[in-house]
């Protein structure tokens, strides 16, 4: 079973990476044309939401008691995979 602290650290690291990518994509949005800007803004909002969800999940994991962590590890890992899919979907719109 994955250790609680390792998973929380993984989530935090991923959210920091996403935060940096959001900044990069925001710069692209500012340089985009009017129509593209609207589409990019939607993607940016989705990306920001996913980064925030990852940070929130990291906090929940970090704050969980060991017994609770045993119960939530599977669901937390699945939630993280879904966050990654949502992130990839949003990023694909910038390609």
Task: Put a short name on every predicted segment.
Residues 4-94:
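Amphipathic alpha-helical membrane/lipid-surface binding segments
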């Amino acid at each position: 079973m994955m250790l609680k602290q390792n998973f929380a650290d993984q989530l935090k690291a991923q959210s920091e990476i996403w935060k940096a990518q959001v900044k990069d994509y925001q710069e692209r949005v500012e340089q985009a044309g009017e129509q593209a800007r609207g589409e990019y803004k939607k993607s940016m909002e989705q990306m920001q939401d996913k980064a925030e969800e990852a940070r929130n999940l990291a906090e929940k994991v970090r704050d969980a008691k060991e017994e609770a962590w045993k119960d939530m590890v599977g669901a937390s890992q699945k939630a993280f995979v879904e966050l990654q899919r949502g992130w990839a979907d949003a990023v694909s719109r910038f390609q």
